[in-house]
């Protein structure tokens, strides 16, 4: 920065009196009030320039475009910068002949402000300051790292860790302070009322801007090498010492030794540990315990002494004995209006800076590579749903699914996954992060289903509409009645056990079909000029008659094998029609059916599978005739169009005939209804008859598909008309084929040949209306990021875009452009604008779009760990808005395990996955299960019980129990009996771990469900095993007891929880026996006074009146397992369970997400 004597600046030169402010907004709190005092008198700055030829001879470390703040009204202009040696050069562009140069010998670099929304930073030299602005935060971090490497004379590598993590250099940023603050370099107060200056984002080291270059490199330790001579060595190895920082203590600071007030607002005095946050007087410092306990977050911290070596790839290798369950933190610095920057700094202050990473600076790969050698670790992602998906995808690439559990801290806009896992919809207070880390330590683990979005791009002809236009609906209205009648009576024939109902429905069905054919023939006579359409209609009517005759023959064969009381109506009189031969055969078949039903017979009954196939064939034939009839009615009012599109046959393929070796349909009819290109498309989508029959035979031995859908026999118009009524409940599952052989079942459902994985879905998938709104919002955010920097603004934009779609109705006929299949079964769609596929019960920012969380008579309760998807319809934006306050259910479509969506036409359709939207070209989209991820869910029941116990302890002792005090004094030794009991408990736990590992080789779910508990318990046991019992202290014994108890609860919940895990016979007895042994030993441990309240809360003694009320029926720490109670009840039916045995033994059932 120029002094007062500097009178001239060239265009684009350094600014006079510029301050560290944002280029978009500068508040008074961001201005540097000590700018003039820092110079120590006027100094004349001589401008130094170099030619491009002189610069070319030096090696370039980094170069590129940056914005530079100028002297005229603090405007920003683009300049080209080159860092070569310890000099920074800049000019208007890279081809300029003259470059200004800045000497970096005594320079320091600092971020411009606290939130730093515009990625600006300042280069501070004794003579000038350069305010620069990068395009994104990663580029800013790269420039700062390269400038620091020049100062430290260390090689700069972007691909590895930032050098400041290991060099001890401070990471400066400009900020103001609310109270008097002192410089840690010159010990003088920071200038101005707001004490504006530089602060290290990791260790809170304070400095004037002029003093920053003279600050010692004593930032927070990261590795064993950074500790240096302060390391503590004893007979057990190395120990973690305190790392003290002098002065600037809070007003309420008290000495941990003498319990007196320490610190001062008048001078720099007294000390604070950067790890355990203990504060001491200078005189008391030597009296304090030298070993640092790491404080409140010790479980999550990787101690610097643990990072003591590097592997062949250059990554640090951790010593596992120091880390039970370390925490890896990923922060998206852009999330929450750049609130991520504040959380990034706060986590570096609480944890080891080497375990905190910015997703915007290198992504998650670097952190996962550092932690991949750990047997068990936790991950905390601070950001939105997109950040979580990014980290999970990288976990898949490194194959770390079994080693890590992932938690979410919501900083984004939607945060649907965080809501479901119990972490809330938003989080803005960085001062509460220690409490968040505590809750994360007490969280339970649940499995999250993850789904692959497989795409196959293929241009398909436009899908023919099954519904005539409303103006021409006079004839179509009657045809709709016909089809509804056929579907209704077919359902009665298939489901009714009363023969009188079957006879009546068969009679009405015959009359309806004959009348329907006659109506179609009359409509056909009016369009004889279009021979192609007329021939198609005639062929379809012929096929319809054949299908009805086949159904009657199947019923006739079934009637010969059953006894039914007589009571038959009169024969149906024949009617004149064009197909007279077919009419006569139908009448004869019907009369024969009526007569045969009344005759007793002892022959074996025909399989109902054949009747089911004939009924489905008849329904398809009716639908095909309606398609052709709809085109005929279009010909009456609209000008003649092209021949019938063959793509309509795709909706109802004739696969059932090939499966039953039924060749009654004439080849001429098929050749007429299918063009060569349609046959090619059909061949691409379905297998041939041989493959179909083979697949059908294999599916006959499989259990019934767990697919719950709306009746596939319903037309789109019928489904739309009764969408909100109770008829859906009655028709649900009506026509699902229990033999797995309906013609709608895809015989090659699991084949993904030719498909590519577009992305992975964790939350939800949307196509149509909601995806269009998300796509427009994402485009708006990319064009104007300053308008979308807060959740409130984002919600307002969603409202504006949704209102616009309410008027435009861009996808009002989406059912005509897409086709939906659930578990291979075709789903007729009502009139809708979008389809949503849900994996979690939270959609678009907290909406329960499924409309409930409980099981009913039709659908199962939605869950994100059942490998089942929920499919719902999106009718309009009003429905999406109303569903935020009202639980709507009329738009439910299905629950299934796979979803297939076919996009027809030439134009793409908007698609979104977890809020990320794009335009998907025509083709096929398949949603199939990929894998499962371990997610950390907040366990409020356990937190409540633990808080009640802590309150009870406070009431008994009369003062709060500080967690850090447990580690200040040496742990007490155990008595002989206590050592013996701990030995037996450890042996029982080791036996249980062995049995679980043996069973997990066959039952993967057992290993996934207990993996974290097994690892934690093994680490706790290994601490005491090398020198047992000498190495056993109360702290170690307490840790062992807690981990053994957690393993017991986890295993019990899997064996006897809401969905018990079925093990094979030998493994089940072994695991149960080992679990019972652990239960007995845990009961013995409750006799030890200092372990009683940890393993079993006191339910008999009520707390004093001034204490928080405890839940006396809490079963979080209940020892007796549920399966033991059930076994005792079977043996002694007269015994009654106790009041504490009426609840489930698994506290996970009360956790969010269930």
Curated annotation (Swiss-Prot):
Q: What class of enzyme is it?
A: transferase
GO-annotated molecular function: ATP binding; ATP-dependent diacylglycerol kinase activity; zinc ion binding
- PH domain: residues covered: 59-152
**TM ranges:** none
Give the EC number(s) under which this enzyme is classified.
Answer: 2.7.1.107
The annotated regions of Acidic residues compositional bias extend over 573-586
Question: What is the superkingdom listed in this entry's lineage?
Answer: Eukaryota
Pathway involvement of the protein, from the record: Lipid metabolism; glycerolipid metabolism
Instruction: List all Basic and acidic residues biased stretches.
Output: 656-667
Q: What induces it?
A: By glucocorticoids.
Entry's Gene Ontology cellular component terms: actin cytoskeleton; cytoplasm; plasma membrane
Catalyses which reaction(s): a 1,2-diacyl-sn-glycerol + ATP = a 1,2-diacyl-sn-glycero-3-phosphate + ADP + H(+); 1,2-di-(9Z-octadecenoyl)-sn-glycerol + ATP = 1,2-di-(9Z-octadecenoyl)-sn-glycero-3-phosphate + ADP + H(+)
Q: Which residues form the DAGKc domain?
A: 322-457
Region described as Disordered: 1-54, 560-608, 634-678, 1123-1154
Q: Which InterPro entries match?
A: ATP-NAD_kinase_N, C1-like_sf, C1_DGKeta_rpt2, DGK, DGKD_4H, Diacylglycerol_kin_accessory, Diacylglycerol_kinase_cat_dom, NAD/diacylglycerol_kinase_sf
Q: Which residues belong to zinc fingers classed as Phorbol-ester/DAG-type? A: 169-219, 241-292
What residue range is the signal peptide?
none
Keywords of the record: ATP-binding, Cell membrane, Cytoplasm, Kinase, Lipid metabolism, Membrane, Metal-binding, Nucleotide-binding, Phosphoprotein, Repeat, Transferase, Zinc, Zinc-finger
What the protein does? Diacylglycerol kinase that converts diacylglycerol/DAG into phosphatidic acid/phosphatidate/PA and regulates the respective levels of these two bioactive lipids. Thereby, acts as a central switch between the signaling pathways activated by these second messengers with different cellular targets and opposite effects in numerous biological processes. Plays a key role in promoting cell growth. Activates the Ras/B-Raf/C-Raf/MEK/ERK signaling pathway induced by EGF. Regulates the recruitment of RAF1 and BRAF from cytoplasm to membranes and their heterodimerization.
On subunit structure and binding partners, the annotation says:
Interacts with RAF1 and BRAF.
Q: Which PANTHER family match?
A: DIACYLGLYCEROL KINASE, DIACYLGLYCEROL KINASE ETA
Q: What is this protein called?
A: Diacylglycerol kinase eta
